[in-house]
């Protein structure tokens, strides 16, 4: 298996999407609830904008009854938000567990069809990692991925539409920063993905080494090879530590980049928004709304960034799962093959030869014999 060169994200997602098929209704309802959780955040800036502008322009119109009604409206939105968030937290995770279970079942069934040559060339520890721990992260990935990106896109579009209605120039100025942020973050994201791939591969190597040592524990002790095994494990363990340090270096750079853009966007809102307000292009309440929408956007981007590690873990798990599923069995039924019936029990070898893959010579060479039903035949090697 080639784990050095990663698969393209588009190919991985294409192979993963069919697993949502059985849970399509659950996913749609989950995304609907995700949309409901954005209501409070998107409406609050408009409420504060209205109260601020009314207070500065016509304070008498801002009655106690009006403020209470606005407060009750926002309270209802928060209740809806809480109920929707509960559904997402429970049902979304359960859907993820179902998908993880389906993938593990498919991987196990596929492994049963693979020939001995696959198992001869692949460490059992690597296989175990691929069908167990590698798929754990798929549970989180499978529901958080559509939720987080759907929420981010929805908030971005709605915020842009609302702010464009207030002042298009200032809105375009602020939103021009987002593509630059995305390009910068994507580069670091790819580096993090490559590092996670190395981590998973090294974990598989460690699992394989632990399994070999424990299964052959009696032999190790018989030859007093404990120091050798400890040194081998220590070397692999230290290599894993180096890979993790490398990963966290990229993750730290990733987070610092986003924090820098956070500061730049706030500076832009303060300076540009202040100048627009001085020139009478926006009201004080509008500046409050701009600041809050920018905060909402940055909070959403931070959530995507925090999810980035989980996203890369999930993608790496899917990639390693797909590497198993892409292995073609050496022995397959011909097209239109029929089940064997009316078996009489007679076995006949007609000039049969056999060699293990990559072996230099045949272990069975041009054998011809016939074993009748009930007869016992032994093939004894000649030395």
PLM region spans:
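Extended non-transmembrane interhelical loops and adjacent amphipathic helices
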Residues: 1-21, 50, 90-136, 205-211, ...
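An intracellular "coupling" helix at the cytosolic face of ABC transporter transmembrane type-1 domains
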Residues: 24-25, 113-117, 133-142, 146, ...
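Transmembrane helix-loop-helix hairpins at lipid-water interfaces of multipass membrane proteins
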Residues: 27-87, 164-169, 280-284
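Hydrophobic alpha-helical transmembrane segments of ABC transporter permease domains
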Residues: 32, 36, 40, 44, ...
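Alpha-helical transmembrane segments of multi-pass membrane proteins
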Residues: 32-33, 77-96, 147-154, 175-199, ...
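Transmembrane alpha-helix boundary and packing residues in multipass membrane permease domains
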Residues: 46, 50, 54, 90, ...
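Helix-loop-helix
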Residues: 57-59, 63, 69-72, 162-176, ...
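ABC-type nucleotide-binding domain
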Residues: 333-334, 340-383
